[in-house]
Regions:
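Structural signature of multi-pass alpha-helical membrane transport proteins
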Residues: 2-70, 83-91, 238-307, 316-326, ...
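Cytoplasmic-side transmembrane-helix entry/capping segments in multi-pass membrane proteins
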Residues: 9-13, 64-77, 100-101, 125-135, ...
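Entry/N-cap segments of selected transmembrane alpha helices
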Residues: 11-15, 70, 83, 87-115, ...
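Small-residue-rich segments of transmembrane alpha-helices in multi-pass membrane proteins
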Residues: 15-21, 44-48, 70-84, 106, ...
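Structural signature of hydrophobic alpha-helical transmembrane segments
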Residues: 34-50, 73, 95-109, 133-136, ...
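Juxtamembrane helix-boundary/capping and inter-helix hinge elements in multi-pass membrane proteins
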Residues: 59-60, 87-89, 121-127, 149-160, ...
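Juxtamembrane and boundary regions of transmembrane helices in multi-pass small-molecule transporters
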Residues: 117-123, 172-199, 231-261, 354-362
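Alpha-helical membrane segments and immediately flanking helix-loop junctions
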Residues: 124-172, 192-218, 306
Length: 362
C-alpha cells in the first residue's frame, strides 16, 4: 500500500514536471507567445487547466493528487525563493530614487484601491480581493502565486485572479505604445524615453508584458521599464511579510474574542499555522546574496533556469486542480474590479508619474 502511494505521489510530481517542461518548450519555440505578453507562467497554467478539465482524465488525476498538491505548495515556495536570483538591490540605483518613489506610490494606491473596492463595493471574498490587488500592484501571476500560501486561498480564486492579470496585461501591450505617441504630443518637454519607461515599469502587470509593451516603443524605454519593474517585484518579499503579520494579528483578535466566550481551542491552531512565511524571508535573503555577486554568473544563470522550471511546474499544478465550473461561480465582479484597477494603473499611475517627475525637477 505504501509503495503504491509513493508511486502515485511520484507520478504526480512527474506529471507537473512534464507540463512545466512543455510550457518552457512552447515559449522558447514560439516567440509570438512572449511577444503577445503570454509569459511562461501563463502558458503553464493554461496547459494545466486544459489537462485538468479533460473529463476522461479526471479519475487518473485524482490518483496523483498528492504529488500535484505538493508541487503546487512546496515546490512553489522553493521557486519563489530562487526567484530572488533574478533581482539585485543595485537595480534601485540604476533607476534612481524617483523610480523607487513612483513604484511605492503606485503599489500602495493600487493595492489599497483593489482591497477597498473589492470588499466594500463589489462584496468580493477578501482572499480574492487580496489576490487581484497583489497581482495588479506587484508582478502579476508570480505575486498571486506567492500570496496564495499566506491567504490560503482556494485554487479557483487564484486562477480567477491570474486570468484578470492576463486579460488586462495583454491590453496594456497594445495600449501603452499608443499612449506614448499621445504623451509625446502633449508633454513634449519631458524626457520620455526615460520617464515613459518608468511609467510602463510601474504600472503594467507582468514582467513579460512590460517587455512586450516597452519594446514596441524603443530599446531605451525597454531598459528603464524592466529595471523599474524589477524594483516593483522586489516589493513582493516585504509585502508578504507585512500581509502575514496582518493575518497573525487577525488571528490574535479572534483568539481573544473566543477566549472571552470560553471557546478558544480552534483559534490557537489557527494562530500557530499563520506564522510569517519562511519563503518570503528567504526571498529577500537571496536578493541580498545575489546583490553581493558571490555566486559565479554561470551558477546564477543555472539557478534562474531551474527557478523558471519550478515555477512553471507549480503553475501547471495549479491549473490541473482548477475546474471551469468553479471559475464560472466567481461571476463578473472580479473582472469588473480588475478593470477598474487597470484603469487606475493607466490613468492614476500616469498622474502619479507626472506629479512625481514635476516635483522632482523643482
Amino acid at each position: 500500500m505504501t509503495a503504491r502511494l509513493n508511486f502515485q505521489f511520484l507520478a504526480g510530481l512527474i506529471l507537473c514536471a512534464c507540463m512545466g517542461l512543455a510550457a518552457i518548450a512552447l515559449t522558447e519555440r514560439f516567440d509570438w507567445l512572449s511577444n503577445s505578453g503570454l509569459s511562461l507562467l501563463t502558458v503553464a497554467i493554461l496547459l494545466g487547466i486544459f489537462l485538468g478539465n479533460l473529463p476522461f482524465l479526471h479519475s487518473t488525476i485524482q490518483k496523483y493528487i498528492a504529488g500535484i498538491q505538493f508541487t503546487k505548495q512546496k515546490i512553489l515556495r522553493l521557486g519563489i525563493v530562487l526567484y530572488g536570483f533574478k533581482l539585485t538591490f543595485q537595480d534601485i540605483g540604476d533607476v534612481g530614487l524617483l523610480g523607487a518613489v513612483i513604484d511605492v506610490a503606485v503599489f500602495l494606491s493600487t493595492f489599497t484601491l483593489a482591497i477597498y473596492l473589492g470588499i466594500k463595493f463589489f462584496k468580493l471574498d477578501r482572499d480574492l480581493a487580496i489576490l487581484i490587488g497583489a497581482g495588479s500592484a506587484i508582478c502579476g501571476a508570480a505575486a498571486i502565486l506567492a500570496t496564495e500560501p499566506v491567504v490560503k486561498a482556494q485554487n479557483e480564486k487564484v486562477t480567477v485572479a491570474i486570468s484578470t492579470v492576463v486579460i488586462f496585461g495583454t491590453i496594456s501591450i497594445f495600449a501603452y505604445p499608443v499612449t506614448y505617441q499621445l504623451s509625446q504630443y502633449y508633454f513634449a518637454s519631458i524626457d520620455f524615453p526615460a520617464q515613459f519607461g518608468i511609467y510602463i515599469g510601474s504600472t503594467v502587470h507582468e514582467v513579460a508584458q512590460v517587455l512586450a509593451a516597452a519594446n514596441s516603443v524603443s530599446d531605451n524605454v525597454a531598459d528603464t521599464a524592466v529595471i523599474t519593474k524589477m524594483m516593483r517585484v522586489m516589493m513582493l518579499g516585504p509585502f508578504l511579510l507585512v500581509l502575514s503579520m496582518y493575518f497573525i494579528y487577525q488571528d490574535r483578535q479572534k483568539l481573544r474574542h473566543q477566549s472571552s466566550d470560553g471557546a478558544g481551542g480552534s483559534s490557537i491552531f489557527s494562530l500557530a499555522s499563520a506564522g510569517i512565511p519562511w519563503f518570503a524571508f528567504l526571498f529577500l535573503v537571496v536578493i541580498g546574496l545575489n546583490s553581493m555577486g558571490l555566486a559565479p554568473k554561470e551558477m546564477t544563470q543555472s539557478l534562474v533556469a531551474i527557478d523558471n522550471f519550478l515555477l512553471a511546474a507549480a503553475m501547471a499544478a495549479l491549473g490541473i486542480t482548477t475546474h471551469f465550473s468553479a471559475i464560472k461561480k466567481a461571476g463578473l465582479k472580479p473582472l469588473f474590479l480588475a478593470a477598474i484597477v487597470f484603469l487606475w494603473l493607466v490613468f492614476g499611475g500616469g498622474l502619479i508619474n507626472i506629479i512625481a517627475t514635476v516635483l522632482w525637477s523643482l
